Amino acid sequence: MNPFPRAEISSSALQTNLAALRQQAPASRVMAVVKANGYGHGLLNVANCLVSADGFGLARLDEALELRAGGVTARLLLLEGFFRATDLPLLVGHDIDTVVHHSSQLEMLEQTVLSKPVTVWLKVDSGMHRLGFTPEQFSTVYDRLMACPNVAKPIHLMTHFACADEPDNTYTSVQMAAFNSLTAGLPGFRTLANSAGALYWPQSQGDWIRPGIALYGVSPVTGDCGANHGLVPAMELVSQLIAVRDHKANQPVGYGCFWTAKQDTRLGVVAIGYGDGYPRNAPEGTPVWVNGRRVPIVGRVSMDMLTVDLGQDAQDKVGDSALLWGKALPVEEVAEHIGTIAYELVTKLTPRVAVCLA
């Protein structure tokens, strides 16, 4: 087998995670968020595995067009909306919904001639202060959208949480109250809950939930693990040992000689590095799974390789598999060692890593 790293994507895990989220929010439809190349899992791979999802959320128009070209017929929603008036005929032609979060988008809708109206999800800034119309702007914007012939009726309504991944932070309740007060009595769907909302804030689930990271088997909450919610890691990042060598006490290893062995040991060199998207700043002690056990990274991660301490009596050999993250070694745990979040790890793999659907 070729020794280079690959991301093995489990279709059964994706389907298990969708089912688990439906169980968490039985009254809600599921807008499966597949932006950023399906969180690094492969856009079409994920969409084809999740054909039973009620819709798909994307960040960019080209992602939506790729899904349509790939035969996906489900509802598609551009979570950041459109950015040019010339995008609007594409939304119409390919039956793509759009978020409207800024006055520039509203003006383009009012000024463009379209063959039929576009389905709009009006985004309310309930407290994240990134995208969306403020409560003070909402009524005027809503009325303008209602008056616009290019906007399908009813208008759907949405917001996004700033702190839902902090289960003890009451700011999510503040945001829910603001959104619900502002939109009370209006027709159309409502969507508030991201992965953390769906898992930790059931009162936010509404008509649609928008899970992203949880679909891939990962918890959105630091210190938590997807398995605690019946989720299964959909990605296994695997490579191989390309060298096993005896290493003497007091000898350094790797660039800068930052790690020195305290005793005689055996080192393994794994064929993956920052050129593949594995973080260069992974510190000494970050775990890798080799032959049924965790072994620590030692020395600096280089472009194509990293080194692990297999232990003095190790029997590992060249060609043995090395798991960087997956079911046996949760990506949440690896992210915590590195000082980042699992989202960043799974989405930053480079094109050198083959993504294979299993």
Swiss-Prot record:
The modification N6-(pyridoxal phosphate)lysine is found at residue 35. GO terms for cellular component: cytosol. Keywords: Isomerase, Pyridoxal phosphate. It catalyses: L-alanine = D-alanine. Substrate binds at residues 130, 303. Gene3D superfamilies: Alanine racemase, Lyase, Ornithine Decarboxylase, Chain A, domain 1. GO terms for biological process: D-alanine biosynthetic process. It is an enzyme of class 5 (isomerase). Catalyzes the interconversion of L-alanine and D-alanine. May also act on other amino acids. This is Alanine racemase. It comes from Shewanella baltica (strain OS155 / ATCC BAA-1091). The lineage of its organism: Bacteria, Pseudomonadati, Pseudomonadota, Gammaproteobacteria, Alteromonadales.
